[in-house]
Amino acid sequence: MKIRIIQNCYSTDQQEGCFFEPYWNEIPKTADERYLFFESEVIRKLIIDRWHADSDYFAVLGYRWQDKLWEASDRSRSLPIQNLSRDRLTPQGLLEFVDRHPEADFLSLGRFIAHPVFRLAETFHTGLMETTEKLLKAVHIRFDLRRLISQPIYFNSFVAKSHAMESFVSEILHPVIMAATEDPDLRKLCLRNSGYFRKFRPELAKLFGISYYPLHPFIGERLINLYTMEAGARVVSFDRSGGISRWGRVTASIDLKRRAFGWNWLSRGGWRI
C-alpha cells in the first residue's frame, strides 16, 4: 500500500520542518483568486496534475496540521468545533491509522461531534452559507445546506483513497473553485470579509487589494463534508480507541462510475486550469 502525503508550505522554514513531502505554495505574480482557497486549491491543482495517480492514498495537509488539531482539542472551545481526539496524532500514528482502516474512503485526522456544518460556519463567517448555496447552484448542484448535519472533517485534515479524492475534486471542488473565480457576481460574494480573527498576510493584501481573509478558504475546506454525505462515503475519524466510523446517506464505497452529483467534469471536456 502506497500513501502519498503532501504538506503545503509558504516558506523555506516551513519546508524544513515538514515530516511529509513539502509543496512550495508560491504566491502568484498576478491576482489569481484561486490561490485564496489555499490548501483546497493545492488539492485541486495536484489532482489535476495526477500527483495521486501512483498512490493508493493521497492527502494535502497544512504545515501546521498537528498544531491545528491539537489546538482544537482545547476543552475551552465551543463543543461542536472541539476536537474530541485527545491524543496528539503523530506522523507515524497517521500512517498506522490509515493502515488499520482499509475499508475507509476518507480518514479524518480529528473527531468532532455531528452538527450542522454550514449553519454553524455562518455564525463565524457571515455570508458563507448564502455564498456557498449560490456557488452550488452555479455548478448545477442542488443541496439544502441547512440539512447537512455531519460529523465533519475540518482543516482539510484528511487522507483519502486516491480514486475517492479524484472524485471529490472532479465533482465539486474543481467546479466550485472555477465558478468562484470566473463569475463576476460570485467573485464579489467570495471576496467579502470572512471575519476571521488572524491578520491577513501583507503580501497577499497588496496583491489582492483586501486587508482581511475572504470567504474562499472557509468554503473550500467544508465542501468535503457535503461530498462525503452525498457520495455515501465511508469515513473513519481518528480516536484514541483506534477509529470511529460514519457513512454518508448511501452505505456504498465510492466508485468512479457512480457519481454523487450525477456528473463528472472530466467527461465535460477535461480539466480547465
Describe the function of each predicted region:
Residues 1-273:
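ER/Golgi luminal nucleotide-sugar-dependent glycosyltransferases, focusing on the catalytic module
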